[in-house]
Amino acid sequence: MKIRQVRALTVTGGGADYHDQAEDHWIDDHVATPMAKYPEYRASRQAFGINVLGTLVVEVEAEDGTVGVGVTTAGEPGAYIVEKHLARFVEGASVTDVEKIWDQMFNATLYYGRKGLVLNAISAVDLALYDLLGKIRQEPVYALLGGPVRDELQCYATTGRPDVAKELGFLGGKMTLQHGPAEGVEGLHANIERLRKMREQVGPDFWLMFDCWMALDVEYATRLAHAAAEYDLKWLEEALIPDDYWGYGELRRRMPSTMLMTTGEHEHTRYGFRLLLEMGRPDIIQPDVNWCGGITELIKISALADAHGAMVVPHGSSVYSYHFVITRHNSPFTEFLMMHPQATEVVPMFSPLLLDEPVPVGGRLRLPETPGFGVRLNPEVELRRPYDHD
């Protein structure tokens, strides 16, 4: 069966661009970032424009009218790339030509792509192709990937309230780091004091982690890690900018051996992860399947990690990563992003954009046998097609 049409759509508000939230959402409340060196951009990530792109939805329609859906953070610029460039490699191809289509999209965009926005767009197309193939074959995507190796997924929560996450049955709670190097010793002490208070609340047998969102340097991250070890910090995540592979290697040497070093949410393709694994030596890599190149590339990234003895715990991405994680032995648990504004309730990550999105109960998540990724676009969400290529 052939593919008839590709459509790139945009939406404003909650969706794949989960930073595009209303004010007072915990996910945007004083988070350390590379921009925190500038005081005017310290209190909010939206202040420097983290939500300017918005959500991109890609629909791939087969000759029989079956539609596959993929999403990412790319908005209108990503829609232009899909409609004006990538669509030519998809339309007219067989629904089973997933690997060939990926290779053509990647190689055709090398001169302006390789990472970032272009890979986000490629990822959305790739995910839509997997969703389409699963629907046509009447199989969930995890069946296309070799089948599950476990009955359910164990989840940790990324949250502003690890204490609530513990009550809800999650493995652990990952907090955003609030203060970076520009805030000096006082900020470092504030980070540790927050960890101390949270450890006091949750007790000894619950994971606590810090997400540093690329905000630190090797020296600060080393000091933070050793100070946090007293309160049994499980891991330090994305301490450095993605391109500092040498710095990650040095940080791994300096960190306490009992603490995990994790990173990779803003890395792309097997080539970037090869550098990261060989030079940075992380314990866990965290590719985002909506950004890193889609399922097609995540398969290769995961194999690389397995050969390097690293775990793969994808960043966010809900069903699009769940269907992968459940098929891999080196992905022993998964992330669940608490998207309730106060992080006090379990709500679907991509709400209101997607319907039928499964959520964990008691910190555990079971995937249904629904074909494809098992989700539908919400007809009440207003989608716009800013470009076409007809």
From Swiss-Prot:
Example of a GO biological process term: carbohydrate catabolic process
Annotated Pfam families: MR_MLE_C (PF13378), MR_MLE_N (PF02746)
The keyword Magnesium appears for this protein: yes
Protein family: Belongs to the mandelate racemase/muconate lactonizing enzyme family. RhamD subfamily.
Site residues by UniProt (Transition state stabilizer): E335
SMART domains: MR_MLE
EC number(s) on file: 4.2.1.90
Gene giving rise to this polypeptide: rhmD
Site (Increases basicity of active site His): D288
Cofactor note: Binds 1 Mg(2+) ion per subunit.
The protein's name: L-rhamnonate dehydratase
Organism: Saccharopolyspora erythraea (strain ATCC 11635 / DSM 40517 / JCM 4748 / NBRC 13426 / NCIMB 8594 / NRRL 2338)
EC top class named in words: lyase
Function: Catalyzes the dehydration of L-rhamnonate to 2-keto-3-deoxy-L-rhamnonate (KDR).
Family matches, as PROSITE patterns: MR_MLE_1 (PS00908)
Cofactors that this protein relies on: Mg(2+)
Enzyme active site: H315 (proton acceptor)
Residues that bind substrate: H19, R45, E335
Keyword Coiled coil listed: no
